[in-house]
Amino acid sequence: MTKLIVYSKEKNPQCDELKGVLNEVGIPYHEVDIRKPEVIMELHKNGCHSLEPPVIKVVHARSTQQFFKNDDLFWDGQLVREAILDVMHLSRPSLS
């Protein structure tokens, strides 16, 4: 099973937008405050040096993990909704 962790901070429009899309699509996630020193150390230890929220970590069943930074999820300040589906390896709903 795939687990999603969202590293975010309060009152951040991009974090709110990302969480809104995750809720809308029905993707469960665990939220962590990216401003905490121990969280920053954990991210750095795992090779993720971007602290511009949101950052997401996807942990796959085989214990492999991937980090996706703000730049991976947003283009020109806008959330790329398809990126969320790609991150979770979900198929896109067909447009009718």
Language model segments and positions:
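Short secondary-structure transition/capping segments
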Residues: 41-45, 64
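Non-catalytic, surface beta->alpha helical segment in thiol-disulfide oxidoreductase systems
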Residues: 58-95
